[in-house]
Swiss-Prot record:
Disulfide pairings: 66-78, 145-167
InterPro entries named among the record's database cross-references: BamE-like, Beta-lactamas_inhib, BLIP_dom_sf
This protein's name: Beta-lactamase inhibitory protein
Keyword Secreted included in the entry's annotation: yes
GO-annotated cellular components: extracellular region
Length: 201
């Protein structure tokens, strides 16, 4: 979560795959299987705000389903519901490894569903680097996307904020299986830096 721009989006995608298998997406039946009563949910993810402390995050998320990770031990990874062979998950990054550090990044996989996905390949192709977030959403459909990751590198300043959206076609999203028609869009300071799509028609 500590990179920016189009390269950041590609690296985040790779990290998400690793995280799904290694932390947030522990294989079903493993010793680290989640306690279903307290798993991370979309509501909990939304409730956890930038600027919260590590303890505040754990109080909301449920410490029994979370663990610390990251190169400097400054991230918290929390498991959600079962999603095929893996788990949905959320990751929260902090301004430092200190106990009183503040949340400066959030990411999630399969916790937030698009409200009304209508993305198509034609709409995706109309999206160009340099568009604002508002312009992109007006093109792909306001209900097609959810926030995959958001990072404030100079928190509490909003300068340099990076945002990644996951967007879907009408049948693309699945909370428990593989995504089908979908796209990732990466922004820095509200301006599109790059895009990628899978199986859109």
């Amino acid at each position: 979560m500590r990179t920016v721009g189009i390269g950041a989006g590609v690296r985040r995608l790779g990290r998400a795959v690793v995280m799904a298998a290694a932390v947030g997406g522990l294989v079903l039946g493993s010793a680290g299987a989640s306690n279903a009563a307290g798993v991370m949910t979309g509501a909990k993810f939304t409730q956890i705000q930038f600027g919260m402390t590590r303890q505040q995050v754990l109080d909301i998320a449920g410490a029994e389903n979370c663990e610390t990770g990251g190169s400097f031990g400054d991230s918290i990874h929390c498991r959600g519901h079962a999603a095929g062979d893996y788990y949905a998950y959320a990751t929260f990054g902090f301004t430092s490894a200190a106990a009183d550090a503040k949340v400066d990044s959030k990411s999630q996989e399969k916790l937030l569903a698009p409200s009304a996905p209508t993305l198509t390949l034609a709409k995706f192709n109309q999206v160009t680097v340099g568009m604002t977030r508002a312009q992109v959403l007006a093109t792909v459909g306001q209900g097609s996307c959810t926030t995959w990751s958001e990072y404030y590198p100079a928190y509490p300043s909003t300068a340099g904020v990076t945002l990644s959206l996951s967007c879907f076609d009408v049948d693309g999203y699945s909370s428990t299986g593989f995504y089908r028609g979908s796209a990732h869009l990466w922004f820095t300071d509200g301006v599109l830096q790059g895009k990628r799509q899978w199986d859109l028609v």
